Amino acid sequence: LQLAGKPENESLLGGAEEYAIECAMLKVYGSEALDYVVDEGVQVHGGNGFSAEYNISRAYRDSRINRIYEGTNEINRLLTLDMTLKRAMGGRLDLMGPAMAVQKELMSIPDFGTEDDVPFAKEKRQIKNLKKAILMVAGAAVQKLMMKIEGEQEILMNLADMAIETFNAESVLLRVMKIIDQRGEAVCQPYLDI
C-alpha cells in the first residue's frame, strides 16, 4: 500500500484489515479447539481432573474463565460474515458470480464422472463442495429474508461456522500440499495421514 502512495500508518492498517476475516476465523477455531481439548483432558483424568495437583485443573480453569469473560467468538463469527459481505458489496469480492453458478449447477444434471488420479483430488472436491454449500445456504437465506437477515443471528452464526470449518479444512490441505512439495512424499506420511 505504501507503493501506492499511502502513508505508512494507513498502509499498516490496510494490511492488517486485509487479514481480519482470516484472523477472526482462526481465533474462533483455536479457542474452541482449546476448550474441547481441555474438556477432554478433564474427562481423561476423571475426578482427579479438578484436583489442584494435576495440571489439567489449571488448564480447565483458564479455559473456563476465558469462556466467561471473553464472548468474542460470537462477535468474531458475526464479523466474519459482515466483513465478507462488505467486501462483496464494495466490489472487492465476487460472491454473486459463484453463487449464481452454484444455483445453476443445482438445476443441471450432476457429474458422476470418475475420480481423478491426481493427488488430493478427493479432498479438493470436498472443499469445493463445502464452498458450494456455503454459497447455496447463504443465497437461500438472502433470497428468503432479504434485509432481515442481519437480525437472524442463528442463521449468521451457522453460516460463519460453515465458513470457519471450510477455511480450516482448506488451510490444512494447502499446508500439507506445500510440505509435500518441499520435502517429498516419502518423508511426509504423517501429514498425508491427516
Where are these regions (language model features)?
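Flavin-dependent oxidoreductase catalytic core characteristic
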Residues: 1-194
